[in-house]
């Protein structure tokens, strides 16, 4: 079970939002590169970046901050990025800059064929982000709620080579209310693509529940406010997850 620190970028700063509300942003750092280095020093094995301005604008808006993060990371760990990725040219540029995996969100909902094109052009480098409120998929920086069900959409991507589905429960994001285990498990059981949980991670109980769900296809969780507010220590939490993964794997064997 991989705990993946999130670095959400707004106006060049590292922030955390509450339920995706851009007006409820807490600035945690004005130096994104230093924040990336901090999480690496805490044992991060992967980083999750989101260009929040880009998600609303439909194109990248924090490229200088992204580049400062990539410079700080070097080749130490993989970096994935979502927010405002709408065309193949942007994906190619990001991969050339050092991003390991792009996350297609709004474009995956509005134009699923774009995901197939991206997977064909850049195999092994594409994830899909499905963000939902009360089971309905949201787009455009969570500002619009569609009529799409998460599972129905996710199934469209099964045979195209998508690396993972990042499933975010918007109502829990930034609220420290616990991961929506039930919905995450339901999605993982319904599709063949690995699932990364997002939204609400708050304590070791969440980590234990996620580790139990690993055999169903839940491969990781995005860690946001919990590690920024020090409710969870990243190094200790990842160590605990590793121990649980080994424990439950032995039970399966």
From Swiss-Prot:
InterPro entries per UniProt: Aldolase_TIM, His_biosynth, HisA_bact_arch, Isoase_HisA-like, Isoase_HisA-like_bact, RibuloseP-bd_barrel
S-S pairs: none
Molecular functions (GO terms): 1-(5-phosphoribosyl)-5-[(5-phosphoribosylamino)methylideneamino]imidazole-4-carboxamide isomerase activity
Family annotation (SUPFAM superfamilies): Ribulose-phoshate binding barrel
EC number: 5.3.1.16
Pfam families, alphabetized: His_biosynth (PF00977)
Primary subcellular site in the record, as a coarse category: cytoplasm
Annotated GO CC locations: cytoplasm
Localization: Cytoplasm
Enzyme class of the recorded protein, top EC level: isomerase
Active site location: 8 (proton acceptor), 131 (proton donor)
Domain of life: Bacteria
Family: Belongs to the HisA/HisF family.
HAMAP family: HisA
Protein name: 1-(5-phosphoribosyl)-5-[(5-phosphoribosylamino)methylideneamino] imidazole-4-carboxamide isomerase
Organism of provenance: Polynucleobacter asymbioticus (strain DSM 18221 / CIP 109841 / QLW-P1DMWA-1)
């Amino acid at each position: 079970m991989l705990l993946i620190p999130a670095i959400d970028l707004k106006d060049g700063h590292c922030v955390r939002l509450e339920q995706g509300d851009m007006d409820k942003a807490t600035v945690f750092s004005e130096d994104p590169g230093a924040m990336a280095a901090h999480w690496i020093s805490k044992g991060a094995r992967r980083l999750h970046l989101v260009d929040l301005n880009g998600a609303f604008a439909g194109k990248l808006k924090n490229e200088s901050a992204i580049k400062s993060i990539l410079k700080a990371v070097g080749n130490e760990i993989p970096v994935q990025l979502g927010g405002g990725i709408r065309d193949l040219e942007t994906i190619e540029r990001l991969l050339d800059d050092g991003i390991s995996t792009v996350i297609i969100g709004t474009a995956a909902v509005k134009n699923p064929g774009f995901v197939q094109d991206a997977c064909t052009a850049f195999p092994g480098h594409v994830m899909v982000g499905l963000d939902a409120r009360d089971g309905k998929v949201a787009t455009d920086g969570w500002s619009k709620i569609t009529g799409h069900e998460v599972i129905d959409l996710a199934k469209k991507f099964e045979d195209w080579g998508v690396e993972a589905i990042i499933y975010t429960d918007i109502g829990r994001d930034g609220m420290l209310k616990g991961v929506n285990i039930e919905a995450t498990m339901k999605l993982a059981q319904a599709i063949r693509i690995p699932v990364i949980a997002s939204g609400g991670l708050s304590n070791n109980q969440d980590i234990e529940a996620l580790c139990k769900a690993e055999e169903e296809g839940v491969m990781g969780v995005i860690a946001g406010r919990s590690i920024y507010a020090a409710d969870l220590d990243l190094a200790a939490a990842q160590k605990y997850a590793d121990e649980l993964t080994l424990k439950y794997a032995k039970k399966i064997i």
